[in-house]
Amino acid sequence: MKAAVVTKDHRVSIEEKRLRELRPGEALVKTEYCGVCHTDLHVKNADFGDVTGVTLGHEGIGRVIKIADNVDSLKVGDRVSIAWMYAACGNCEYCTTGRETLCRDVLNAGYTVDGAMAEEVIVDANYAVKVPENLDPAAASSITCAGVTTYKAVKVSGIEPGQWLGVFGVGGLGNLALQYAKNVMGAKVVAFDINDDKLNFAKELGADAIINSTNVDPIEEVNRLTNNKGLDATVITAVAKTPFNQAVDVVKAGARVVAVGLPVDKMDLDIPRLVLDGIEVVGSLVGTRQDLREAFQFAAENKVIPKIQLRQLSEINDIFDEMEKGTITGRMVIDMKSTH
């Protein structure tokens, strides 16, 4: 079968791979679609360590074509996800308290185990979440990581109906954060970016305000919008240091700043302000299986509509080049059905 494999020179090679036999508790999935995430770029570039030889992809959607022994959660024909959280131990303090994404023994698709940019992929049946049949599978691929990650982050922000939430970076993740915040949580949303095309798209999606941080002072604009109060919370999906710092600067006392993007950098934190204003800065890592079920359902109800563009597996290096240049709006999704 064809698979997108990480090479030593930080590129991706389309190679023929052969899967091992299924083990108890596993299922074999024929991949239909796989979204391309910024984390895939980090993995390819060895930012998290060298994983030469691994098959990329953790925004996969496909149909179960075979199940192993001891599998009763799935059946042949089910449409399921192949997500970043491939499997966890199920027994630790995190797994038993609803925080399974923090499991120290977690396996990650497309990083520590082979992922979904392949014609077929092996999944842990207990961690493959079923996809609603009325949800377009190509759109569902974007929800599998970008969607659940931003949905969880918006939940972590504690935002309430009518409050102001700032979303920093409105690309593949941020446009979904905007939709979950506005259409599910009932928040007022300010979109921050340095790309006018992405900001205009955010406005089309319903952003209450858009701010190009290179043209205006974000603090001044937020003060104007909120009568000098500041935002109630911010979510950062951008992958640069500056927006992380700005996201702290524009919030009010008692606000929560949720970090999602993964720039290889460090934040500059004004400690006296954090302490005196009681500002919380927290990280949010993807989402649990239950978060993913909820995120899928909101998409199936058309409350969240991912903007996607179908691409071919052979274009994967071009997609990464575009990603590094910051020219992508929405989500690139590999049409794996065209490779079968």
UniProtKB/Swiss-Prot annotation:
Cofactor binding summary note: Binds 2 Zn(2+) ions per subunit.
Entries under SUPFAM superfamilies matching the protein: GroES-like, NAD(P)-binding Rossmann-fold domains
Residues engaged in binding Zn(2+) 1: 37, 58, 145
EC number, as in UniProt: 1.1.1.1
Cofactor(s) this protein requires: Zn(2+)
Top-level taxon in the UniProt lineage: Bacteria
Top EC category: oxidoreductase
InterPro entries per UniProt: ADH-like_C (IPR013149), ADH-like_N (IPR013154), ADH_Zn_CS (IPR002328), D-isomer_DH_CS1 (IPR029752), GroES-like_sf (IPR011032), NAD(P)-bd_dom_sf (IPR036291), PKS_ER (IPR020843)
One Pfam family, short name: ADH_N
Key words, A-Z: Metal-binding, NAD, Oxidoreductase, Zinc
GO function terms (MF aspect): alcohol dehydrogenase (NAD+) activity; zinc ion binding
Ribosomal protein among keywords: no
Listed PROSITE patterns: ADH_ZINC
Catalyzed reactions: a primary alcohol + NAD(+) = an aldehyde + NADH + H(+); a secondary alcohol + NAD(+) = a ketone + NADH + H(+)
The keyword Zinc is assigned to this record: yes
Sequence positions that bind Zn(2+) 2: 89, 92, 95, 103
Family of this protein: Belongs to the zinc-containing alcohol dehydrogenase family.
NCBIfam families xrefs: PRK09422.1
Protein's recorded name: Alcohol dehydrogenase
Species this chain originates from: Staphylococcus epidermidis (strain ATCC 12228 / FDA PCI 1200)
This protein's encoding gene: adh
